[in-house]
Amino acid sequence: MTDSLVLSLAKDLIARPSVTPIDEGCQKMMAEFLAPLGFEIEPMVFHDTTNLWARRGTTGPVFCFAGHTDVVPSGPAEKWHTPPFEPTIIDGMLYGRGAADMKGSIASMMAAVQRFTTDYPAHQGSIAFLITSDEEGPFINGTPKVIETLEARQEKITWCLVGEPSSTNHVGDVVKNGRRGSLTGDLTIYGIQGHVAYPHLAENPVHLAIPALNELASKQWDQGNEFFPATSFQIANINSGTGASNVIPGEMQVQFNFRYSTELTDSQIKQQVAAILDNHGLRYELKWTLSGQPFLTGSGKLVEATQNAIKAITGQETELSTSGGTSDGRFIAPTGAQVIELGPVNATIHKVNECVRVADLETLSDIYYNMMQQLLVDHD
């Protein structure tokens, strides 16, 4: 039996061991597929990262498919049922690293676009692809750099569909219409090193820090809102001491992270943290890393088209959610684009034996096609 177009594309992509930030020719394959469909191909390489901007059409509105060709490492290959970079179908499931996150989505996008441009060669506006090999890594030279380039030449995205695996039990049951912000603090608290038998001659930074850390951990930062849960503070790493049991440490390192809602800004969080540390009289140094601002796509054409398409293809209603981690949508939303995430079931992402139901990729492609019909075809 001959593979469908979606399955053939997915297998081709999975077979390329594109561990971040290596692309392994995935984007070249995509470019060769899209160019005959009328797409202008623009590779954007920044340092070790390969990016692709492909666009069909010169006018607005711009419907953009966004995603990444890089994958996380496979882990021990011997723990997989099948080799992680040899796409294999077992009982209707396609196994391989990247099957769900997110080469399956990319294959569904490509097949949907081929079908749509064949059926509607004179569609309204433009269709674009923004693809990077740096989503699973440090996300420095990927989507942020492409967006900088587009913004510099005033090239705007109207609607953006990120193919991250958003679904929980079946395709389309959950759509991400926003994400929480992520802010990490690296805190060093200073004391005075000394002998444990002479505590009066030392200052133990661990003892000094505990009350402040307890206040940070127990504080209700906000109540959240109808779209976002309350802001979360979590301590990720703590390090102090020399390893000797008779030495009071001279300093203590604490790393913590905020996942925050639209009820707070990163500036407000920084100010409140500093106030708590200062109130406890600590001597400290604090460095911040902002991974992304929170964003929300409320009611509008993109959300409406997404809900309608899922209902039309699957017969099911969808849940709008902002839960989970960050995605590259956080770099696209600040440009003013409406952004949603819609992809396959995420139960096996980043795991051994990552897999996706083959039928789900076909369903996903049909949903993507339906969305383009709603947004890029004149129905008058």
Curated annotation (Swiss-Prot):
Matches recorded under SUPFAM superfamilies: Bacterial exopeptidase dimerisation domain (SSF55031), Zn-dependent exopeptidases (SSF53187)
Cofactor binding mode and count: Binds 2 Zn(2+) or Co(2+) ions per subunit.
This protein's pathway: Amino-acid biosynthesis; L-lysine biosynthesis via DAP pathway; LL-2,6-diaminopimelate from (S)-tetrahydrodipicolinate (succinylase route): step 3/3
MF annotations from Gene Ontology: acetylornithine deacetylase activity; cobalt ion binding; succinyl-diaminopimelate desuccinylase activity; zinc ion binding
UniProt: Zn(2+) 2 binding residues: D101, E136, H350
Enzyme Commission number(s) of this protein: 3.5.1.18
GO BP annotations listed: diaminopimelate biosynthetic process; L-arginine biosynthetic process; lysine biosynthetic process via diaminopimelate
Cofactor or coenzyme needed: Zn(2+); Co(2+)
Keywords, ordered alphabetically: Amino-acid biosynthesis, Cobalt, Diaminopimelate biosynthesis, Hydrolase, Lysine biosynthesis, Metal-binding, Zinc
Reaction catalysis annotation: N-succinyl-(2S,6S)-2,6-diaminopimelate + H2O = (2S,6S)-2,6-diaminopimelate + succinate
Residues that hold Zn(2+) 1 according to the record: H68, D101, E164
InterPro entries recorded: ArgE/DapE_CS, Bact_exopeptidase_dim_dom, DapE_proteobac, Peptidase_M20, Peptidase_M20_dimer, Peptidase_M20A
PROSITE patterns named among the record's database cross-references: ARGE_DAPE_CPG2_2
Active site feature: D70, E135
Superkingdom: Bacteria
Enzyme class, broadest EC rank: hydrolase
Keyword Glycosyltransferase listed: no
One of the Pfam families matching this protein, by short name: M20_dimer
Subunit text: Homodimer.
Family: Belongs to the peptidase M20A family. DapE subfamily.
Cited function: Catalyzes the hydrolysis of N-succinyl-L,L-diaminopimelic acid (SDAP), forming succinate and LL-2,6-diaminopimelate (DAP), an intermediate involved in the bacterial biosynthesis of lysine and meso-diaminopimelic acid, an essential component of bacterial cell walls.
NCBIfam families according to UniProt: dapE_proteo (TIGR01246), PRK13009.1 (NF009557)
Designated name of the protein: Succinyl-diaminopimelate desuccinylase
Protein source organism: Tolumonas auensis (strain DSM 9187 / NBRC 110442 / TA 4)
GN (gene name): dapE
